[in-house]
Each structure stands twice: as structure tokens, then as C-alpha cells.
Amino acid sequence: MPAKYTLRYLTLVTNSTIAAELRPSTWSPLRHATFRALWIAGLVSDFGAWMHEVGEAWLMTSLSPSPLLVALLTSADSLAIFLFSLPAGALADVLDRRRLAIFTQVWLLVAALTLAVLTYEGAMTPWLLISLSFVMSIGAAVDAPVWQAIVPDLIPRDELPQAVALGGVSINIARAVAPALGGLIIASIGPYAVFLFNAITFFYVIAVLARWRPRSAKANLPPERLLGAVQSGLRYARNSPELLAVFFRTGVALFASSCLLALLPVLARRELSLGSTGYGLLYGCMGAGALLSVALLPTLRAKLSEDATLAAGSIVFASVLVTLSLLHNAWLAGGAILIGGVAWLAMLSSLNVGVQTATPSWVRARVLSIYMIVFQAAIALGGLVWGTLAERRSLRMAFLAAGAAMLVGTLVGRKWFRLSGRAPDFSPSLHWPKPVLVRQPGAEDGPVMVTFDYQVPAENQKRFIRAAKRLEPLRRRSGAYQWDLYRDPSKKDRFVETYIVDSWADHLRQHERLTVEERNAEARVRKLLLAGTSALVTHLVEVDAETELKAEPADQD
């Protein structure tokens, strides 16, 4: 699976998407003109992308017989996404998404056109190809969260699952057909032709985006600063056990499966003696398997949990890796890869469901960027490891080791990192009252300490401490970078909860981010308080003494 071009799809999957049954309503988002135009543009771009991917991989096998260099092509793609995805997610949450999307399409257009010209002129080298692939992946890293954030603005909320399902259909139609088509073009014209076709597809996407005029909503608060937005995304993910489990399972699945993704060109050319057309057909088997999975997954999901679906897909994919290490027949290899495509989508859909259902909308682009970082870091590391193993030992050894790694990782994940299958209630609660102030802080004034003063009877104090401790990850996820619980030794029943956020604007954002889950957690704390009392809330804004003193005349002695 190409690292550069599947990211848009990864960021759009929800719990009712890939495995969604193709009900008539699945097509309903196409009634909306802007969504329809962008969906068609995406389909055209997907065809160009998969053809481009086949061209890159085949060109590298022509430039160098080294399995390591072929694998490094995948690793370079993943490294770019690893480095740039999180800042890109923050940008998608705070900048004009339409302009950012147009910028990324222009970036990708220029990079693809450069690759086409240099290949046509015979000036391409292995390391230049890796470098240009890295440059294109930077554009893809920025593009993915932008598309994720755009789609909900194009359609009614109740049609979002169907819209995302259509995104999956687009990707997998292209993945099933485009590699074989790309192989035919490479065989008849040359790799430069598929690079040129890919560049041309970006013109259409740019034209559609240029015509789109999104609805602009007036923001009540200034946009987050880039660094602060990145930090809040990391803080949210770090304090979500559900997300940490998804990230571990993603790392395991992608590290092992990257063996097939990175070394398929070597398998096709060296072990199966295929040309570019045969390689394209072999690549297309993975996409055909993924399309087949769309029909099979609803039945599977009706019987298995997300965690069990992930485990089943992982075991089947591990079996495919082991099988490919033993095969020398192209037809049998194609059948195995077809089954691998089914298993791949079963794994991917379960992971995507896990990350989407564990993330509220305000931080979704950033969390999905972290997910993509884990995704691509695992592919990059795996490509390096399996490519090195194939070069120093054998291709068979690399596939066997990858299959074993998948099985071991699945067992560890099932034991300690299970997908909960529980979707937290992220419905806005807005249950905090507006602070009563005699002096209005500036948006960037801070840090701000918020305190909750509790009175707790002795018989409830242990239960209170446990309940209050459960508030810590919720406070941190909504913006706090420090949280503490204090006991007053001068009073038998007084406890004080404190947390600190960067600025007054960040605290006001917390008010907007409150969910039913947090309201319920706070209600459990309140039940343990002294009868007739409630939490006393105060807000303390740090004094910038230098600024305050400059604003007032000096005191006269």
C-alpha cells in the first residue's frame, strides 16, 4: 500500500464505513454537488496515485537490483509522513482548509511533474528517486488531515458514514484497476508516462477546489497557535488508554505487513520472473481483495468484536506472508495476495474504527495525524528491517520473519492492548457555567490555574480520591498540562483539585470541549461530597509583574 496516497482514506474511516453494507443510502452524499465533484476528483487522483506507485517501485528495480534500496523507497515515504503529519494535523485544525488543500495539490503536481521530466530525460538515479518520493510524501502528509477535516463540511452530519464509505470505494476501485493499467503503460511507453498522468490528475483536483466556496463560521475564540495545537494533540493521545491500545496494535500490524508492501516488486521480478504488467496485476490483487473485504466484513463484524476482527485479519495476513515465502508460482502468489487484501482491510478497518471512535471532533485531525505517524513509522522501520534481512539473508527469510512477528505481536496485543470496542460519549455537555469575573483576562493571558475546593466526609475519602483521580486524564485531554489533588492538613474534610492550562483562551476552549463523559465523571465525584456542599471553583491567572508595573505609575514613597 503506498504510503503517500492512502492517508486520505485512513483519515476518513469511521465505525460504519469500510465494512458498511452497500445500502442504497450509501450513494446519497453524491446528491451534493460539491461533494460529488470532489469525490470524482479524488477517484481520478487515486488512479493516478496507484499508477504512480507502480511506476516508482518498478523504476527502482530497474535502476538498482538491491532489495534494500527498493525497501528504502517505502521507508522514505513513511519517514516524511512521520515527520510532518502532526504539524499538518494542527495546521488543518487552525488554518483555511481550502487554501491549504490547494497548496498541497500544487506541491504534489510540481513534484510529480519533476519526476516525469527527469525520468524521460534519463537523469534519474536511485537516490534521486528516493528524494523525490520523500518530497511528494511531505505533500501527502499535509494533504491527508485537510481532506479529513473538509468532508464533514460538505454534507449533512447523518450522511458522513456514507460519504466515508464512498471514499473507501474510490480508493479500492483505483487500487484494483490502476496498478494493472500502470503496468501496461510502463511496458508500452515507460515509467515517465505514469508520473506524467499522475501530475495531470492534480490539475483537475485543483480546479474543483478553486471553485468550492466553503461556508465560513465565525469563531468565538482565536485559533490555537501551531505549537500549542500540536502539544494539545499529543496530550490528548497520551491520556487516552483507548488510543494507546490502537497505536500499539497499529505499530505491530504495519511493521510486519510492510514486508509485503516493500518487497512485492522484488518478489515479482526475482522470485516470480514477472515483467511490469505482471507486477501491476499482482499489485492489483491486493486491491481486489480489499474490495472483496467490503462485502465480507459486515457479516464478520456481526459475529466478532473489533478486537477479534483485528486478530483474525492479523493471523490470516501472517499466514499469507509465510505462504509467499514458499511459493514460486505467480498464479498461486496472486491468490495469496488476494486473501492478504481481505485480511489487510479487516485489520485496517478495525484500527480505523478504534481511533475514530476514541476521538472527539475538535482534536480529530491531530489524533489522526499521530495515528498516521505510528502507521508510517512502522512501515518505515519494517521496510528497513525486512529489506536488510532480504539482502543479507534471503527474501524467504524476510517473509517468514515478518509472519512470525505478526503472530507474536497479535498475541501480545490481545493480552495487554485490546481494543475496548466502547465508544465514549463525546456529545457536548456544556455543563460548566461561564466564569463570573470582575476583570476580563486577555485571550493569551496565562498560565491559568483552575481549582475545585471539595468537602468530603471521612467515610467517603478513599472513594473520593479514586473518583477524583479519574478526572486527571479528562482534564489533561481537554487542555491541562498539569493536574494535582491536595489535602488540607488543617481541616479534616478539605481537598483541592488543581489543574493548569496555558492561557485564558485555552480554558475557554475547555468549556466548549466538555463532553457527557466528563459530566458523568464529575457527577460521581459530587456524590461523595459532604451533604449540602458543592465544589467551589476559582480561576487564577498568573500575574506578569513587569507588564502590570509598566502600565501603572510607580508608587511614591
Feature roles, as predicted:
Residues 1-21, 436-447, 466-469, 473, ...:
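Short, intrinsically disordered terminal tails adjacent to the first/last structured region
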Residues 4-418:
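Alpha-helical transmembrane-bundle signature of multi-pass membrane transport and export proteins
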Residues 58, 435-443, 484-486:
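Short beta-strand/turn micro-motifs at beta-sheet edges
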Residues 389, 448-455, 484-513:
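Short, well-ordered beta-strand segments in beta-rich or mixed alpha/beta enzyme
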Residues 419-422, 473-482, 500-537:
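An amphipathic, aromatic/His-enriched active-site/gating alpha helix that lines ligand/cofactor pockets
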Residues 424-438:
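Short, highly charged, low-complexity non-transmembrane loops/tails of multi-pass membrane proteins
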Residues 459-483:
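Short amphipathic alpha-helical segments
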Residues 486-492, 529, 541-543:
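A short beta-turn/loop motif at secondary-structure boundaries
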